């Protein structure tokens, strides 16, 4: 065998990739006995491959190759995650459209067409980096088999009463206009203003409250001071008038107010964060919802109606300054939760969503994790910390066009849930009438 004078990686890699395919080296043979399965989440069809793809999936490939070297029958298929929010955002970008401006049927067809146009090149990218999957058996998360599997899982959870629908404040992305789960969040450091503003007491005296979110002044429903904070004990039980918007709010004693943060006085709004949600539920207060689902202010915000959140923030700060209600303003950097898909700061909006019961089953998840062999072992601890840190049940519903539909209907008369029969799966409730009655 003659070796070339100069190694050409492109020629060599393509040669051996073709050899692997022709020889069927990576094909799964169901007739062999000892099977080692690699159950990997399929990569999202959301554009070109990047270094992060290669880094994470090469680790799985190392394991698959190791077990082949041990003469085990490796079951390692290649799939594509080509439904849901990432795919919708890609289609909107490539085709310069907005899903909210199209009918569901039109947009779904456009998504399917776009995926068919780009999928071959996407899969070839994975072949070209040398992934040792069985590419003769690919799957898609939007194919009938996967839809059926997903819908069957939902029905199983529904029968076990592990899934429920509930209207409550939940995390919301105003850019993508959908509810999101805690697992969809990322921390991001952003520039902001930390401002001190005057609230007026009944005797026209002023108290100062610090906030980074003046756009929520219209949503303020009460004020907290710490019971041991001597500066403000005399305020407990009194009312204060919110600057610019003039609604009167009660001042409560509560230990969640941190005397060392800002001015030590905390305004509770509907809804700035999960602590606001807890406080409003605790006091059974009537929320003042000022944000729309697309991230604009509504009529409760008065003259700021129809401004987006950032525009309103700027205008309100300017008006506070004009009215001599702005005590202080300083530039800061702080960590905020953003939606991992688009980088937009998340809000809390009251919407009706489906949830899987996570919080009441935390111990079960941790015990299940202990039965797994973790490599390296510290990843088990990371998993446990992640479970312990979950503070919300898992929101699984999304307000999108292109995805797996819930196999349910709602009775128009009584709003009862009508569940599809497992034999009907996969099913699209928007185009199919229920066989059962409520």
Describe each model-derived feature in a short phrase.
Residues 1-2, 40-49, 100-109, 301:
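Glycine-/proline-rich flexible loop or hinge segments
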Residues 28-90, 141, 150, 210-211, ...:
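N-terminal catalytic cores of NTP/NDP-binding nucleotidyl/phosphoryl-transfer enzymes
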Residues 15, 19-23, 92-206, 261, ...:
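Residue patterns forming the tRNA-binding/recognition surfaces of aminoacyl-tRNA synthetases
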